[in-house]
Amino acid sequence: MKKTKVINSDISRVIAQMGHFDKLSIGDAGMPVPRTTEKIDLAVTNGVPSFMEVLNNVLEELAVQRIYLAEEIKTENPDMLAAIETRLPETPISFIPHTEMKQELNNCHAFIRTGEMTPYANILLESNVVF
């Protein structure tokens, strides 16, 4: 059995396959995902697992150089924005319109669906190198 923090086989596989500048997305239960993007559905019920639980788990194994958030999170979900900024204090943030965020899912290795039920709780993680 795997000893590291990420034990979900699909998430582990996707992270292992990622290279520099590749993207992985984590989001709320309502985010529409293109059919061409792999969806790893972890949602069980309202709030389970939470967005932050999944983000914290993924960050145990994924080196991230930049994150992308919806511009709308600033006004529609400031508590989530604060939690993300606290978790990734040194990581540059690019704010983009939510419509662009949905389009960017076409360029992601995968989308991890959580049970999060708060607005604009979606993130694009741009991978870094570990050397």
Swiss-Prot record:
The active site is at 20 (proton donor). It is an enzyme of class 5 (isomerase). GO terms for biological process: D-ribose catabolic process. Disulfide bonds: none annotated. One of its GO terms (molecular function) is intramolecular lyase activity. One of its GO terms (cellular component) is cytosol. Pfam families: RbsD_FucU. The keyword Cytoplasm applies. Substrate binds at residues 28, 98, 120-122. NCBIfam families: PRK11797.1 (NF008761). Homodecamer. Belongs to the RbsD / FucU family. RbsD subfamily. This is D-ribose pyranase.
